Amino acid sequence: MAKEKITEEELVTRIRGEITSSLGYMGDTISKQREQAMDYYYALPFGNEVEGRSQFVDSTVSDTIEWIKPSLMRVFASGDEMVKFNPVGPEDVPAAKQATDYVNYIFMRDNPGWEIMYSWFTDALLSKNGIVKVWWDETDEWDREEYKGLTEIEFESLVSRTDVEVIEHTVVEEDGVEAQMTEEMQEPVVLHDVVITRNAGKGKVVIENVPPSEFLISRESKNIQDARFVCHRVKKTLSELKEMYPDEDIDPETLGGGGGDSGMMAFSAERLARYRYDNSASNFGGWGDADVADEEGLREYWLHECYLKTDYDGDGITELRKLCVVGNKVLENDEVDFIPFISLTPIKIPHKFFGLSIADLIMDLQLIKSTLMRNLMDNMYNQNFGRFTVLEGQANLDDLLTQRPGGIVRVKSPGAVQRLDTPTLEPYSFQMLEYLDGIRESRAGISKHSQGLDENALKSHTTATAVAQVMSAAQQRVELIARNFAETGVKELMRVIYSLV
């Protein structure tokens, strides 16, 4: 006996369960690690500072990531072509060249390719995995056009087109027409002033970066395409929801905040960490603008764009479905064959979706270096403004407490005032800092002497001579990151763009 189709209420319940148990959900270990990485990237205080003591914070995480990015961007974006399609046979040469030109045009011209690549790599280096979303956007683009003095025939010819929508229309009489009227003309000649919008084309490939805090994936997943559940949660205004789903009856009273956890997501520590450096999130409670919150069209709701494998029709075979949910309302429920997200990570862990970020490797070094520098600076303060032993009644304490160049201290007997020795830490601290820099170089593949990568280092025709030009074994770590990005993320993105067109 065949099972019945899943109801909308059952779908919403299933989706909520998948969201709360997914990786990247607010408050889980992945989310906390990414929040901590953002704090280290901004070199924010650790929370263990002592008043009156040094509060120095080292910037190892941000320095290392910012040193790696130029090498990666030079490898991927220094030339005119982000991707090149190779022909299989001689007959494929024209098609391969055309595909190369068109995909590069879509990525660099139709979309902000450089910005996408830069943000993608930054997310991966800092937050374990960088995520981009690529899809075919069927939203119509309309151009505004204005015409004046059209005759009746011209006007009818214009507005009869299916790709034209009239915005404004004014009928005017031609000047001097009464004097020129003949007996055959029973009506005066009229002209038309009209403003229209013309459909400039339907659909294009759209690529956008997905903030790590907005991406969810089922815990057992090894990659995106094989995952049971993937979700992109994003804030949308009521106006945007109505534009996206014009055929749906969207009632603000039934949407709530877009889900039972909407309040928690608005104040998610991981999301707010991105704004913590300049405290730019302090005035809007995590999202939105309080000044416009009362305007209905600008009220914001959490939209969950979910890709779920489920036996929706009850035939015993699961299919991949795209479900867009706001609160308890399902706005879209379609069967699809592709999940439009692509991920890359600098250090891939086999059989696991989330890898390791560069920040994961060196955050402990930043804490140790900060502690050493604080101790070193406190030691220098103590040397410059040390402590003294004073024989009671044998020295003038006011003179001793008054710090001024060339000042004197009146004493009644020699040796009444003696300085307490403060051991110097400089030689040992600097040696330790150099040792930590060496550890950072071996872990992250970057040092203060690194000059980046050869732009030809990763190409297929690389010779033994070119490989020998690598200055140190540490730089091979950066090369491996670049190759990993190319094989697991960039190549897949270009392939998807090609398949969409």
Question: Which residues fall in each region the model found?
Answer:
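His/Asp/Glu-rich acidic catalytic environments and adjacent acidic regulatory segments
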Residues: I362
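Extended, helix-rich architectural segments
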Residues: M1-V325, Y428, M432-Y435
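Long amphipathic alpha-helical segments
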Residues: V61-V103, E319-F354, A359, M373, ...
